Amino acid sequence: MSKRKVAIIGSGNIGTDLMIKILRHDQHLEMAVMVGIDPQSDGLARARRMGVATTHEGVIGLMNMPEFADIDIVFDATSAGAHVKNDAALREAKPDIRLIDLTPAAIGPYCVPVVNLEENVDQLNVNMVTCGGQATIPMVAAVSRVVRVHYAEIIASIASKSAGPGTRANIDEFTETTSRAIEVVGGAAKGKAIIVLNPAEPPLMMRDTVYVLSDEASQDDIEASINEMAEAVQAYVPGYRLKQRVQFEVIPQDKPVNLPGVGQFSGLKTAVWLEVEGAAHYLPAYAGNLDIMTSSALATAEKMAQSLARKAGEAA
């Protein structure tokens, strides 16, 4: 099977890490162009040193390059506002181009590979939610495939050092997009997301807490589903792990809790604690929040490339 050529828009932390992953390991993708807006950026400099074509003129620069004619898939690691413009420009120039959105813009459907990649592999634009979403939504989905979930709340704690300008500029979009994806992909009736930028030195790894309120069900079945889901995520994010055993608490009918926007609740509370260690391809190991985004986007692009090859009649 021939490799599908890809471009990355955004030469910051996420874009650069993604480029290195593709260059080092990928079997189905060929890194063709790195796109930025700062000619002095480290990402563009690294791309040039690694033999990748570059432009510092943004999406317009990409479309003016001869390499653009052969690009099948574009990763966008800019910002939510920029992605809307990038999608419109690329779609006008090449209607069938595939975009993998690593911003909270969410023009296309949310994609969490271990939960719903197969049903979205032929979409022209997919959104990778957020780092917190990629880490925690699989856990919500693991519960919701066993029992009805009324409410899910996630707290994503990431090292402040790992949060670049793009992350900081999109905090509101982070919470909104993640909350919505907890419902749409995770299967919760109501979702809530909180992000914490941890200033600790030395920087700590990404930690995530997931609280799920559901109807009562077999705790063994729920725990087994969660463990199975965690193993599935580890297939493309090796540093993803449960920090401790799943904890349960039964909330009795005569002592319900009040959930804003939901009302009174009684049933089962499931608590999951996660840790995500980065692969340290470009970023430090503590930046698991960025690694899970690039790894999830890469897993999505690989499936897209295989789907495109099948449609073209190529052997896998």
UniProtKB/Swiss-Prot annotation:
Kindly state which reaction or reactions the protein catalyses.
acetaldehyde + NAD(+) + CoA = acetyl-CoA + NADH + H(+)
In short, the EC number is 1.2.1.10
The entry's NAD(+)-binding residues are: S11, G12, N13, I14, S162, A163, G164, P165, G166, T167, R168, A169, N170, N289
Q: In which pathway does it act?
A: Aromatic compound metabolism; 3-phenylpropanoate degradation
Q: Which residues form the active site?
A: C131
Q: What class of enzyme is it?
A: oxidoreductase
Among Gene3D superfamilies, the record links this protein to:
Dihydrodipicolinate Reductase, domain 2, NAD(P)-binding Rossmann-like Domain
What are the BP-aspect GO terms? 3-phenylpropionate catabolic process
Where would one find coiled-coil regions in this protein? none
Q: Which NCBIfam families match?
A: ac_ald_DH_ac (TIGR03215), PRK08300.1 (NF006157)
Q: What does this protein do?
A: Catalyzes the conversion of acetaldehyde to acetyl-CoA, using NAD(+) and coenzyme A. Is the final enzyme in the meta-cleavage pathway for the degradation of aromatic compounds.
| Protein name stated in the entry | Acetaldehyde dehydrogenase
Species of provenance: Escherichia coli O157:H7
